[in-house]
Amino acid sequence: MGLYLCIFDEDGEDICGVEVGLYNYFEEFRCLISKYTNKGLASKILKRKSRFTLPMTTLLNHSDCDGSWNVDECVQLKMELQEIKQVFMNELPDLSIIELKQDIFKFYGIKPENLFECFIDSDCEFRIDRLLELCDLAIQENRSMMFQ
């Protein structure tokens, strides 16, 4: 079963949505971001600094199985995603992610050149870009982003 993030209009019609992919793909995306924030015990012991200036709490602290991000949270989420994109575009691809998704990458002929390109949605579009577009629409339409 996969995660679908979407925006509904006032009549409950789906305006736009993103098939994020399997729940475990979204979870590994968030786990990697968490590693880059260096909030784990090992990072504290080794005194590693976060590669992000933002704490990434909007993305990391929300359950992925239910609920929504309201418009204010979408504004914050957009800032987080912009920073994630900037950092990930300058990082090497993660071999464990490539291995996890090797069938998808092979099918679509994708060879990620950086960490940003390791994350695609079910339509083979870059996940972070699609989430940024969804944030923009939620803000523009003054609608929450729903987890389905």
Where are these regions (language model features)?
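Acidic (Asp/Glu-rich) sequence patches and key acidic residues
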Residues: 1-133, 137-148
